[in-house]
Regions:
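Solenoidal tandem-repeat scaffolds enriched in leucines and small polar residues
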Residues: 169-262
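Hydrophobic membrane-insertion alpha-helices, especially the h-region
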Residues: 32-49
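A short beta-strand motif characteristic of beta-propeller blades
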Residues: 55-68, 98-105, 136-143, 180-187, ...
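Short loop/turn segments that connect beta-strands within beta-propeller blades
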Residues: 95-97, 134-137, 174-179, 227-230, ...
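Short beta-strand elements that form the blades of beta-propeller/WD-repeat-like
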Residues: 74-87, 91-92, 113-125, 130-131, ...
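N-terminal Lys/Arg-rich, disordered targeting/topogenic segments
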Residues: 1-31
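Repeated scaffold domains used in trafficking and secretory/extracellular systems
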Residues: 68-78, 107-118, 146-157, 190-199, ...
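Structured, soluble extracytoplasmic/luminal domains of envelope-associated proteins
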Residues: 101-155, 278-306, 317-318, 328-333
Length: 383
């Protein structure tokens, strides 16, 4: 023990630089491994995405079936992930398992439905009633004294109406409870006959397409209204008008970026309305326009196919998809017979015939086609 006590206390000299080097090397190795793993995951995700984009289907498997207890007069729409069914005598809102969420009775001769992300309005064309709903049920009701010609709805539930009586047209703007926000007469002798109306996403901008043939020639115009500060000092809130000769504009729609799309018999026009309305882009059809459809993000045209390409010349139709800036996303020729074309909620294109369904991706891939043994009324994307 004495000898042990006589031994001097010893310390171990630590090489700090060597330890730092080893720590750095370890970190680099771990970062490389993490980078490799991340790269593999990204590659797998990309391959899976491509696989789903190009994968095709020609059949289906029914997981749940439900016999219809209603008549063929009922129309089905998707609304906030559930199903809105409406007819002349009422509306029913159910989940995808057919469990009732709410219902509303009414009497309409020609009901039409317009929807935004959170609200739906059911109006009686040529009648005087409009009901406004959200996912929980009735929000408000509008009763007019003049027949309804058009109904449009904004994101916050604001409803725009085009009314007509004895050859005189009127505009009416209401909030989601049915309270009147603005209304007035359209002077046809000054601007023509109204063809369509459009309401912006925020409900602050409004447009009317007019047709004038009073002097024996065809003239069209689009009048723009602003109910925000930009239109406060303007007469009747009109902030601008675009005029066109020798074309008819039967349909106008606001897109998600608040640009306006005008569908004429000769071309498609994209107008910017944030300031003074001006035309940003014009797309000539090149052949006969068969169908126009849109969903706010994308615009779809189906035209007669006049391609001389060996691979495409035998196809009957040419489908063109544009984004809301007017840029061409995809052009695809096809020969499938259809009676209706629309975008699904996942932006895929659905073509419906009486008992046939065809679905195209935005890449132009025919993802699904099948002929059913029963009539198809509506296709909704699964969750």
């Amino acid at each position: 023990m004495a000898e042990i006590r006589r031994q001097p206390f010893q310390t171990v000299k630590v090489d700090i630089e060597e330890m730092d080097r080893k720590i750095r090397e370890h970190r680099i190795r771990m970062l490389k491994r993490a980078g490799i793993v991340l790269g593999i995951l990204i590659l797998l995700w990309f391959l899976l995405y491509i696989y789903h984009q190009v994968r095709t289907y020609d059949s289906h498997e029914a997981k749940v079936t439900e016999d219809r207890q209603d008549s063929a007069a009922n129309t089905y729409l998707e609304f906030q992930g559930n199903i809105l069914k409406y007819s002349n005598d009422g509306a029913f809102y159910t989940d995808t398992s057919n469990e009732l969420i709410w219902n509303q009775s009414y009497e309409m001769s020609d009901p039409v439905v317009v929807m935004s992300a959170k609200y739906a309005a059911i109006g009686d064309e040529k009648g005087t009633l409009v009901y406004i709903f959200d996912k929980d049920g009735l929000c408000g009701k509008i009763e007019t004294t003049k027949p309804i010609v058009r109904v449009k709805i904004a994101e916050q539930g604001t409803v725009a109406l085009l009314l007509e009586e004895n050859g005189v047209s009127y505009l009416k703007l209401c909030d989601k409870t049915g309270k009147t926000l603005a209304e007035g007469e359209l002077h046809v002798e000054n601007s023509g006959y109204p063809m369509d109306i459009a309401l912006s996403k925020d409900g602050k901008q409004f447009a009317v397409s007019m047709l004038d043939i009073s002097d024996g020639t065809i003239k069209s115009s689009i009048a723009f209204y602003n109910f925000d500060s930009a239109g406060e000092k303007k007469i009747d809130h009109v902030v601008g008008t675009k005029k066109y000769s020798d074309i008819i504009i039967p349909q106008i729609e606001f897109l998600e970026n608040d640009n306006l799309i005008a569908v004429s018999n000769q071309k498609l026009m994209l107008l910017e309305v944030s300031g003074k309305p001006q035309e940003k882009k014009s797309i000539k059809y090149g052949s006969r326009l068969r169908t126009f459809f849109y969903n706010g993000k994308y615009i779809g045209l189906i035209l007669d196919n006049e391609s001389s390409s060996k691979e495409e010349k035998n196809d009957v139709y040419c489908m063109q998809i544009y984004d809301n800036r007017g840029a061409l996303v995809k052009e695809k020729t096809f020969s499938r017979t259809y009676r209706k074309a629309e975008f699904l909620n996942n932006n895929e294109v659905c073509l419906l015939n009486d008992n046939e369904c065809t679905i195209f991706t935005l890449r132009g891939v025919e993802k699904y086609h099948e002929a059913w043994d029963k009539s198809i009324y509506k296709v909704l994307p699964g969750r």
